């Protein structure tokens, strides 16, 4: 509003024109979909998918070790999360496999399996992979035949040149060839080349809509509710001093000045907001809970879990049952994607190193399966394993694997035999002493 200023020199009062400014309203954004997608991703591939395989000979065992080595060198453990996250939020993702010249991979592999290369031509190619998705700037064009089999795959993307300019590139991959074009003044075809794999080196996952589309209305309403509530707090939360009566004068120093009020009903009090906004709290909690419940996503936070107490593994299984059911549904696409990846790598290793793996790649059977994330209760697992082994239901080997020590099964079995032999020897020595 306009302000009046008294000029002591002229003895006149001037009025300064009011200046108006635009005050921005609160706009609170809530990354609800991002949190749900991250939790779903962690439950789906937070625990590495299992690989079930029983090699029938040494060649198949070497091939299985080679598949695991390819997974490790390509950091598939982390790429799985990128694939699932892109599939849930971006609707589609593709994984492209190619070869590079790198003989160090095979040197490390032969050293690990403690054997020497037995072929005539030592392999020099290494399998590499790259992820394509819309948020990474890729436009994906899968091509399927009438039976639903993908027979070709195309990708459009931008490539930055040395002068910071960008050109559009297009590539098409078939079961044998890779074709590329650059769009500068017109489409210029680059020299096509063969990828050298017996199968199409592209894995593709698609879903018809983003995973969190059904909860978008909850998030929009929640953001509007909290934004309006924030504006309400800014205008009404901080108390105002209400003065009732006639102002007779001021007392005290400037800093601690007091107002003297007179007249009937003279009073001074703060205006405070005494009403508790229960309706706002109720709607916010309801919308948030509905968003997580509709997406079968558990709310993993301190506030949510602090009332659980000392929960056992069984209690956590019931708590995460909805998330595990969602993982089973994800397996329709992601499980198939992972299985096709394993099958492709097996065939690719057979083509890269035919001397060692050509025959084994045609006979080996590797099955992969999603393992939903679970907070393991070690005490429950050990108790179950001990009961099953002592009851004759499981072998000692199976009990060790169930208890979570699968990486050291042979070592543990050998140590158990040694300890048992030592105990039997001690018992025999005591028996001889007692007899004498």
Locate the predicted segments by residue:
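Alpha-helix boundary/N-cap detector
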Residues: 11, 19-36, 42, 58-62, ...
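C-terminal helix-loop subdomains that flank or include functional centers
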Residues: 247, 256, 261-264, 279, ...
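A short, surface-exposed helix-loop junction/capping segment
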Residues: 64-66, 266-269, 320
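Conserved aromatic-histidine-acidic binding/catalytic patches
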Residues: 21, 46, 51, 55, ...
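Extended, helix-rich architectural segments
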Residues: 1-127, 436
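Extended, regular secondary-structure scaffolds
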Residues: 81-84, 88-89, 94-207
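Extended, charged amphipathic alpha-helical segments
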Residues: 186-315
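Short amphipathic alpha-helical segments
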Residues: 59-63, 72-80, 87, 214, ...
């Amino acid at each position: 509003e306009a302000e009046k200023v008294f000029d002591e020199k002229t003895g006149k009062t001037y009025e300064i024109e009011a200046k108006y400014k635009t005050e921005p309203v609160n706009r609170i954004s809530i990354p609800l979909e991002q949190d749900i997608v991250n939790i779903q991703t962690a439950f789906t591939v937070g625990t590495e998918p299992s690989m079930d395989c029983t090699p029938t000979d040494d060649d198949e065992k070497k091939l299985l070790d080679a598949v695991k080595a390819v997974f490790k060198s390509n950091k598939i453990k982390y790429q799985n999360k990128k694939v699932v996250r892109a599939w849930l939020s971006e609707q589609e993702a593709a994984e492209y496999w190619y070869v590079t010249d790198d003989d160090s991979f095979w040197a490390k592999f032969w050293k690990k399996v403690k054997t020497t290369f037995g072929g005539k031509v030592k392999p020099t190619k290494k399998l590499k992979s790259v992820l394509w998705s819309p948020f990474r700037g890729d436009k994906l064009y899968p091509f399927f035949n009438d039976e639903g089999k993908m027979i070709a795959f195309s990708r459009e993307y931008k490539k930055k040149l040395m002068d910071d300019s960008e050109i559009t590139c297009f590539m098409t991959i078939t079961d044998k060839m890779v074709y590329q074009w650059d769009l500068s003044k017109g489409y210029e075809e680059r020299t096509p080349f063969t990828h050298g794999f017996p199968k199409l080196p592209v894995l593709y996952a698609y879903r018809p809509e983003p995973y969190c589309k059904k909860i978008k209305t909850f998030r929009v309403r929640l953001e509007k509710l909290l934004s309006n509530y924030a504006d309400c707090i800014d205008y009404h939360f901080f108390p105002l001093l209400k003065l009732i009566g006639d102002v007779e004068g001021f007392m005290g120093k400037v800093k601690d000045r007091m107002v003297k009020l007179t007249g009937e009903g003279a009073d001074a009090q703060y205006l405070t907001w005494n009403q508790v906004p229960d309706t706002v709290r109720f709607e916010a909690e309801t919308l948030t809970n509905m968003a997580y419940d509709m997406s079968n996503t558990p709310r993993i936070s301190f506030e949510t879990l602090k009332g659980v107490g000392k929960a056992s593994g069984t209690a956590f299984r019931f708590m995460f049952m909805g998330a595990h059911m969602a993982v089973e549904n994800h397996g329709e696409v992601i499980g198939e994607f992972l299985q096709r990846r394993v099958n492709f790598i097996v065939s690719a290793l057979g083509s890269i190193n035919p001397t060692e793996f050509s025959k084994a790649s045609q006979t080996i059977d590797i099955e992969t399966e999603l393992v939903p994330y679970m907070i393991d209760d070690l005490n429950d697992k050990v108790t179950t394993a001990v009961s099953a082994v002592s009851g004759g239901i499981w072998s000692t080997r199976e009990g060790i694997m169930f208890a979570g020590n699968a990486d050291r099964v042979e070592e543990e079995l050998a140590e158990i035999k040694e300890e048992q032999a030592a105990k039997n020897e001690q018992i025999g020595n005591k028996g001889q002493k007692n007899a004498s």
